[in-house]
């Protein structure tokens, strides 16, 4: 069993004590959406107001921007549409924003949709037929396209035509409709879930990575300026450190800290104020929330640090296994607090230290 270091404050939100089953059922009220990386309907308009409008304003992803600048320049010289582009990586890193920027740089329109909305063939055919020369069609969660919609994209991407089958059996006929040259930009968090025929039709396949703290600090400072929120650089750094490497989360946390400063009648966001506000929101110094810490604490306390299976962790914490795997684990893996092995999940020494436990490598001590 892991031993809690007595030097830690037992009531600190950053180093919680062992979480009992009763405490798990009565978890503190927290807006879990703060650290979610998915877009929220009520914040989409606000997000649009702070999106960068061109590549020069887009912070981070240096390697990606260099590749895209070359692609844009070449397409303009040839007077052609951009090559089809597949963007993959964790949510909240700016895939939709990049599609809008590319449309602005090329001087064309960008139509945005998501694969779950394209349930019937006519949903995607309507979009394709109405595209003008050079337009961009952005499909989010493209790995979730159904087979029929995906197959309609094959000739559209390769030959700028739409093949529609009419009739059945021996009387079936294929009618080809010419399309304007266009660019398909697909976004996915699961590139491995794409079929090879679809993936191979993209001329450019680029990965978006998590942001560094200094990059997120620039994001926070830029957003604060747009929102007319006064903030010290140290305050921006504190928010950046707790933003899980994700701009969308950084902007969301900034707004909550801004509100906290407003209620407290404090003119400028300092490091101390940002830390105080985020501690009250249960977002700790590494960006972990209550559920992140619960998952790690459960693995350490109940299963001696692991290895333990995902379903077992889910049952022990009362959280959905898919939610743990897709929402919480990616960041825990990224910062080195969790290892995912064939035998199960293992909490690392860094996780022990962060939660205030003594790390015992050989946990099978009698």
Curated annotation (Swiss-Prot):
Organism field: Gloeothece citriformis (strain PCC 7424)
Q: Give GO MF terms, alphabetically.
A: ATP binding; ATP hydrolysis activity; four-way junction DNA binding; four-way junction helicase activity
Which terms are listed as keywords in the entry?
Answer: ATP-binding, Cytoplasm, DNA damage, DNA recombination, DNA repair, DNA-binding, Hydrolase, Nucleotide-binding
Quaternary structure (record): Homohexamer. Forms an RuvA(8)-RuvB(12)-Holliday junction (HJ) complex. HJ DNA is sandwiched between 2 RuvA tetramers; dsDNA enters through RuvA and exits via RuvB. An RuvB hexamer assembles on each DNA strand where it exits the tetramer. Each RuvB hexamer is contacted by two RuvA subunits (via domain III) on 2 adjacent RuvB subunits; this complex drives branch migration. In the full resolvosome a probable DNA-RuvA(4)-RuvB(12)-RuvC(2) complex forms which resolves the HJ.
- Name the record gives this protein: Holliday junction branch migration complex subunit RuvB
Basic and acidic residues bias spans: 21-42
Q: Which domain of life is it from?
A: Bacteria
What ranges does the record give for the region Disordered, renumbered to this chain?
1-49
Q: Enumerate the residue ranges of region (Small ATPAse domain (RuvB-S)).
A: 212-282
Indicate which residues the UniProt annotation says bind ATP: 50-51, 92, 95-97, 201, 211, 248
Main location as per UniProt? cytoplasm
Renumbered to this chain, region (Large ATPase domain (RuvB-L)) spans 13-211
Q: Which family does it belong to?
A: Belongs to the RuvB family.
**Entries under Pfam families matching the protein:** AAA_lid_4 (PF17864), RuvB_C (PF05491), RuvB_N (PF05496)
Catalytic reaction(s) noted: ATP + H2O = ADP + phosphate + H(+)
User: Where is the protein localized?
Assistant: Cytoplasm
What residues bind DNA, as annotated?
340, 345
Can you name a GO cellular component term? Holliday junction resolvase complex
The entry's free-text remark on domains says:
Has 3 domains, the large (RuvB-L) and small ATPase (RuvB-S) domains and the C-terminal head (RuvB-H) domain. The head domain binds DNA, while the ATPase domains jointly bind ATP, ADP or are empty depending on the state of the subunit in the translocation cycle. During a single DNA translocation step the structure of each domain remains the same, but their relative positions change.
Q: Which residues are listed for Mg(2+) binding in this entry?
A: 96
Q: What does this protein do?
A: The RuvA-RuvB-RuvC complex processes Holliday junction (HJ) DNA during genetic recombination and DNA repair, while the RuvA-RuvB complex plays an important role in the rescue of blocked DNA replication forks via replication fork reversal (RFR). RuvA specifically binds to HJ cruciform DNA, conferring on it an open structure. The RuvB hexamer acts as an ATP-dependent pump, pulling dsDNA into and through the RuvAB complex. RuvB forms 2 homohexamers on either side of HJ DNA bound by 1 or 2 RuvA tetramers; 4 subunits per hexamer contact DNA at a time.
Q: Known EC number(s)? A: 3.6.4.-
Q: Where is this region: Head domain (RuvB-H)?
A: 285-366
Q: Name one GO biological process term.
A: DNA recombination
